[in-house]
């Protein structure tokens, strides 16, 4: 049960990335009865959760590690994702290292420059890639220990452009052109991107578990 009621947080997204929080709120808007996504879905900083070191070797391991740690720290249902870009000719790299491919975590511009330079000689026909996401939900037991856990997956396939295009989104959005599209992910509206994105697919697959977890917490 949520004893605070009102606008108290009910769901924590285990990230400090405002772009991811914005995407999750839009995906959840209107999907969970009685949930005010603008006040009750918060990020790790707002919930007072600690930073989590990603020590897993797969997207699923990292997402579960983060969700579990935040659920234990806050006593609330927690969601985490680990996502990245998998480039065919690079054997799936950058993969779990996508956010720090150039060395500094979250330096999108440097990551893009390095990736494009590494692929400069790769012909268009071999520039296939995909955004991959593993999204995890962790619901603590009443004593604060790990309880129910669920992991779902999503993928967005496309090709890598030779130059960044568009100003929307974040990360590698400016260089991935989804299959069947003539625009980059960064040129899509938020609604268009959420409808096809890897993160959108993973979180939509997770929605039934989220709804059930929040319903049980209010019972």
Where are these regions (language model features)?
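Anionic-ligand binding patches
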Residues: 2-12, 18-219
């Amino acid at each position: 049960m949520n004893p605070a009621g009102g606008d108290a947080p009910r769901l924590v997204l285990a990230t400090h990335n405002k772009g991811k929080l914005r995407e999750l709120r839009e995906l959840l808007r209107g999907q969970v009865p009685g949930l005010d996504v603008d006040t009750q879905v918060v990020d790790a900083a707002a919930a007072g959760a600690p930073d989590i070191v990603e020590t897993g070797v797969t997207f699923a391991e990292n997402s579960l590690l983060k969700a579990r740690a935040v659920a234990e720290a806050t006593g609330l249902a927690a969601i985490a994702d680990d996502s990245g870009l998998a480039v065919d000719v690079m054997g799936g790299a950058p993969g779990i290292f996508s956010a720090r491919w150039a060395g500094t975590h979250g330096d999108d511009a440097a990551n893009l420059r390095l990736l494009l330079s590494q692929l400069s000689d790769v012909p268009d026909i071999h520039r296939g890639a995909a955004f991959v996401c593993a999204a995890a939900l962790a619901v603590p037991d009443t004593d604060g220990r790990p309880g129910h856990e669920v992991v779902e997956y999503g993928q967005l396939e496309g090709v890598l452009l030779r130059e960044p295009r568009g100003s929307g989104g974040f990360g590698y959005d400016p260089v991935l052109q989804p299959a069947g599209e003539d625009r980059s992910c960064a040129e899509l509206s938020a609604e268009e991107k959420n409808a096809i994105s890897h993160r959108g697919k993973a979180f939509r697959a997770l929605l039934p578990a989220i709804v059930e977890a929040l319903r049980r917490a209010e019972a």
